[in-house]
A protein has these predicted regions:
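Flexible, polar/acidic helix-loop-strand segments at domain edges
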Residues: 323-417, 582-583
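Long, intrinsically disordered, low-complexity segments
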Residues: 93, 103-106, 181, 259-314, ...
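Short coil/turn linking the two alpha-helices of tandem helical-hairpin repeats
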Residues: 146-148, 153, 197, 217-226, ...
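Bacterial Sec-dependent N-terminal signal peptides
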Residues: 1-31
């Protein structure tokens, strides 16, 4: 979001909406690429004009910030001495820079396309739908910005602010006002959007669901770290989420693992998502997470996720341990296996051309997996199972095209799911009370939990607590870019509790797991001995716990931004956003 530069972004909207990366939150699309005279001439062009917002401007965030900020910082992911793990990240960190660039890029694209859509020569319904999609994505970008940095500038119209020459003179706006701006933006989006849209694209229910989530976060913003959440905001979160649950016609998928399969890319549970395509010539249209998170050799192309591993603390939350004998592991939560691969796990939906995927065989059988990295590399005994598509045959089967040498896939990233909305409702109904016996709140909580654990009964639940709902959110949405933001919004109203959760996490790895896994496999798994030598195979306590302070809940601004706009280091200003801005 470097404010000094006015370089333009090339936008190829007529060729599927590709966008290149940019670094400025006052950037705008290159007007030479298209103009009102040669584009926005009919319904098809108008609908296509928004496609870019589902992919390219988010790419730089996806590559690093999407999993480093919400997953490593939250204690869901382990990655050695990563500064996000020990809270030593600074404004020179590439993930911080890329995240900032990406989110301001989304805002710039949404602003520019929205303004051009006003004069589009298309049917009124198509124009309104496209404009509503723009505003929803803009709101999503600001929702990330305010939860990552807190007080941030508001750039309502890039072109007018560039023309005014204010790009080095932007002041931060108080986070509470930024939240109100997001609410205002989503209210307009809801007004514009229809109740149904093309598969994979945002409709009114998606915007309402996002607004419910925004209200839930906003409810604590004025508590200064210790106080009662705003009851009216909680009521709005409950009202909106219940409306989506009861009236959208959308349902939870029956099997949790199915949500993340390629054939369900645009499933109705995915209310808002990034819709990637490996088919585009612009690599920023493809999903890079399989390369980032899958272990080496998992597919025919590049991947380097061996050392980015599900944390010990997340395994604890699921009730499992890497020291558990695979034959007697007792967890009956189906989300665990769909979230992380552990010793003994097999998957029938990956490597379908080879009869399925076997995790230990992949690690230790070079005939089966010639590209694997010579045994277990993960310090926590597990690897990530979400966001990866399998091998290229699986990609072709799901999408009809090869992932190609670009190493990027067509697998959607679900940014907001219906299950999230169920848990938003349950938490909003609990509100400031700590627990509830409200039947509708328990129903919502139970629907999510029962999908994952089939052998539980509704009559077992007569009360649910806030801690239960927050844990359920962690398990349900693990590796989907969410848990850190649950802790951030907790820090608004109970910062000591948020800090204590992090202080008490097991954020290190294990000693001795490669020897345990290799011996088990080589001695005839699944019937070989599982011999745990507790003197050698144990949780590592030599690395000290990170220094957890109140400051960790906001990232530093990129250093380049601060150099060009010193106002970013000054006190934020109050802005009456409803008086100042309008759509």
């Amino acid at each position: 979001m470097k404010l000094s530069s006015l370089k333009y972004i090339a936008v190829a909207l007529m060729l599927g909406g590709a966008i290149t990366s940019c670094s400025d939150f006052l950037d705008r699309p290159n007007e030479d690429s298209y103009n009102d005279g040669n584009y926005y001439q009919n319904d098809t062009q108008t609908k296509m004009s928004v496609v870019s917002l589902y992919t390219s401007p988010w790419f730089d965030f996806l590559c690093r910030g999407y999993y480093k900020i919400p997953e490593i910082m939250s204690g869901n992911l382990y990655k050695g001495q990563d500064p996000f793990l020990n809270f030593t990240v600074n404004g020179s960190d590439e993930a911080v820079i890329q995240t900032s660039n990406s989110l301001w890029n989304v805002n710039a694209q949404a602003n520019t396309i929205y303004n051009r859509l006003k004069s589009a020569k298309a049917s009124e319904s198509v124009k309104r739908t496209a404009m509503g999609e723009c505003l929803t994505w803009k709101a999503m970008a600001y929702f990330y910005l305010v939860r990552i940095w807190g007080d941030v500038p508001i750039v309502h119209d890039n072109s007018s602010e560039i023309a005014a020459g204010d790009y080095n003179n932007k002041y931060k706006v108080k986070a509470a006002d930024v939240y109100e701006y997001i609410v205002m933006t989503l209210e307009k989006a809801i007004e514009l959007l229809p109740e149904s849209n093309d598969p994979g694209r945002i409709d009114r229910w998606g915007a309402k669901a996002l607004l419910a989530k925004v209200y839930l976060a906003k409810s604590g913003i004025n508590c200064n770290g210790n106080g009662q959440r705003d009851e009216s905001d909680l009521a709005k979160a409950a009202e909106l989420s219940k409306d989506v649950i009861d009236n959208s016609g959308k349902e939870l998928m029956y099997n949790y693992e199915d949500i993340f399969k390629g054939e369900n890319n645009n499933c109705e549970e995915s209310l808002i998502g990034w819709r990637w395509s490996a088919e585009q010539t612009n690599y920023t249209c493809g999903n890079s997470l399989s390369a980032e998170l899958a272990p080496s050799g998992f597919n025919e192309y590049q991947s380097w996720g061996d050392w980015t591993a599900p944390s010990v603390d997340l395994q604890d939350a699921f009730g499992v341990s890497p020291l558990d004998n695979p034959k007697s592991r007792t967890s009956n939560d189906t989300r665990r296996k769909a979230t992380m691969m552990m010793a003994g796990d097999t998957y029938d939906y990956w490597w379908t051309d080879k009869g399925g995927f076997d995790y230990l065989k992949f690690l230790y059988d070079k005939t089966y997996a010639p590209g694997s990295n010579n045994g277990l590399q993960s310090a926590t005994g597990a690897n990530i199972a979400k966001h990866i598509y399998g091998d290229d045959a699986d990609h072709v089967k799901a999408f009809g095209i090869s992932a190609g040498a670009s190493q990027y896939s067509s697998l959607s990233t679900h940014v907001l799911r219906l299950a999230d909305v169920y848990l938003i409702y349950a938490e909003a109904k609990i509100g400031n009370q700590g627990s509830t016996t409200d039947a509708s709140a328990i129903d919502a909580y139970f629907a999510v939990r029962h999908r994952a654990i089939k052998n539980i009964n509704r009559d077992e639940f007569t009360e649910i607590t806030l801690d239960q709902v927050l844990k359920e959110r962690r398990l349900e949405l693990a590796f989907e870019g969410d848990y850190w933001f649950d802790l951030v919004r907790m820090s608004y109203y109970d910062i000591e509790k948020a800090m204590n959760i992090i202080k008490n996490q097991r954020r290190n790895g294990y000693y001795g797991l490669p020897d345990l896994y290799k011996a088990y496999y080589n001695d005839g798994q699944p019937n070989g001995p599982w011999t745990v030598d507790e003197t050698k195979m144990r949780y590592e306590t030599d690395t000290p716990k990170p220094n957890v302070t109140k400051s960790i809940f906001k990232l530093p601004f990129p250093k380049g931004d601060v150099v060009y706009n010193p106002h970013l280091m000054e006190e934020a200003q109050h802005v009456d956003v409803r008086e100042t801005f309008a759509y």
